[in-house]
From Swiss-Prot:
GO terms for molecular function: GTP binding; metal ion binding; molybdenum cofactor guanylyltransferase activity. Its main location: cytoplasm. The gene is mobA. Transfers a GMP moiety from GTP to Mo-molybdopterin (Mo-MPT) cofactor (Moco or molybdenum cofactor) to form Mo-molybdopterin guanine dinucleotide (Mo-MGD) cofactor. Belongs to the MobA family. This is Probable molybdenum cofactor guanylyltransferase. It comes from Geobacillus sp. (strain WCH70). GO terms for cellular component: cytoplasm. The keyword Metal-binding applies.
């Protein structure tokens, strides 16, 4: 069993962005490729979790494993993606990144990965007082609790945290520059990063 697998969450509707964010380009690379490269520094196996309508497009652009959410929980957000990968692979830990944080650094991912240990169920960034649940590492023992939440249609990440032992990593212990957490949700935000 591999100790850790990577997950790129790329299944959102991108309504505010107007087109699938995963395929926006920054510095000549698709957003999802930046996330894959960041994870590649700490994991061997990487899964891209996406919407069924985008699966073929991803498969044309990458050799990574591309999957869609378990159909029972499709449309329930990041928790559904994390659950699906936990069911798909045997890794003990799942390192999660969203596809829309083009400033996330491989060095930051490597630093966060060092916090994974058996005392915790999840390692989550709490950067400058803001919890960043989509930049985190989840132990597979959280899978049953995630499934319970999904069955109850409670797809809030914070609901999971109430039921598990979370280690919050702050900026002094992770990464001082807040820009690594800058995500892109709108065309204006995209214009800001490319100009």
């Amino acid at each position: 069993m591999n100790k850790m697998a990577g997950v790129v969450l790329a299944g959102g509707q991108s309504r505010r962005f107007g087109s699938p964010k995963a395929f926006a380009k920054f510095n000549g690379k698709y957003f999802f490729e930046i996330a894959v490269e960041t994870l590649r520094t700490v994991v061997e196996d990487i899964y891209i979790v996406s919407h069924p309508s985008l699966i073929d497009c991803f498969r044309q652009k990458t050799a990574e494993k591309v999957i869609m959410d378990d159909e029972r929980y499709r449309g329930q957000g990041p928790l559904a993606g994390i659950y699906t990968v936990m069911k798909e692979c045997e890794a003990e830990w799942i390192f999660v990144l969203p596809c829309d944080m083009p400033y996330m650094r491989p060095e930051a991912a490597a630093k966060l990965a060092k916090y994974a240990n058996e005392k915790f169920d999840a390692i989550i960034c709490a950067h400058f007082g803001r919890i960043q649940p989509l930049v985190g590492i989840y132990h597979r023992r959280t899978c049953k609790q995630i499934e319970k939440l999904l069955q109850a249609q409670d797809n809030r990440m914070k609901s999971l945290f109430r039921h598990c032992h979370v280690h919050y990593v702050n900026e002094q212990d992770f990464w001082e520059d807040e820009i690594v957490f800058r995500n892109v949700n709108t065309p204006n935000e995209f214009d800001d990063i490319v100009t």
